[in-house]
């Protein structure tokens, strides 16, 4: 009996060593994350992340941002993460402003803001945003102290959004901006039953309508990534990575205060949180075209794969938990 217990103890020890080794790999080689506590934003970078630049209103000072826990002040917030986007950002902003101003002209209750989160850009991205902010009092620049990743940029912007609805949208202009209306109509339906709701823009739900143009290799890589996404805990969503998603304000509070993954693979984590939280989630086809310069390196895909495994393991083992959090 003692011999059997000794052998069992050895097997258990080996299993724990293997699990520990796997966990160490996931924690060491994955993307940047916060592991066991609150989001990084208020804890590590309170001053630089909680202030915005708005020269049209306050030309000589940085002004404290509102947070997602304050009462909404506009109808919709467009959150735009930007890293070295000085060339592509102007076209995207022009199209977005034109659309939003048309909506405003038709409906005085349609109020908006654009928050561009400059993720430690090395080019003139911040200057481009400030040029627009000088002309429009509802365009804001939020500066990250250094490059922290797309997920961190979206997180920072959404946690300081003033809108009843919050749209994350890429700076490259790949998605037709007027498709916001499609997501808006859908989220209004979802909000009737649940204030925590998300509408995911999809490039693959309807290939013809989405006008998706991708190479064969990228399609194969996308298929492999989709399998890992399912393993991570995302079900029922065909396109998790489209940078065009609409959130209710209540959904933002829960999602972005519990987000850990800071770079490319944050989207699946948000959807895992939403599923575990039993949020209403819907997927809508949008018009999307692949933009030159928007491709991810192979090393980035490897990190994404590791992060997907990390999401799968850490949530299943309750290392990452979901709960009500505040600043």
From Swiss-Prot:
The keyword Plastid does not apply. GO terms for molecular function: dolichyl-phosphate beta-glucosyltransferase activity. It is found in: Endoplasmic reticulum membrane. InterPro entries: DPG_synthase, Glyco_trans_2-like, Nucleotide-diphossugar_trans. Keywords: Endoplasmic reticulum, Glycosyltransferase, Membrane, Signal-anchor, Transferase, Transmembrane, Transmembrane helix. Its EC number is 2.4.1.117. One of its GO terms (cellular component) is endoplasmic reticulum membrane. Pfam families: Glycos_transf_2 (PF00535). It is a single-pass membrane protein. It catalyses: a di-trans,poly-cis-dolichyl phosphate + UDP-alpha-D-glucose = a di-trans,poly-cis-dolichyl beta-D-glucosyl phosphate + UDP. Pathway: Protein modification; protein glycosylation. Dolichyl-phosphate beta-glucosyltransferase involved in the glycosylation of glycoproteins through the synthesis of dolichyl beta-D-glucosyl phosphate which serves as a sugar donor for transfer of three glucose residues to the Man-9-GlcNAc-2-PP-dolichol precursor to N-glycans. Belongs to the glycosyltransferase 2 family. This is Dolichyl-phosphate beta-glucosyltransferase ALG5D. The gene is ALG5D.
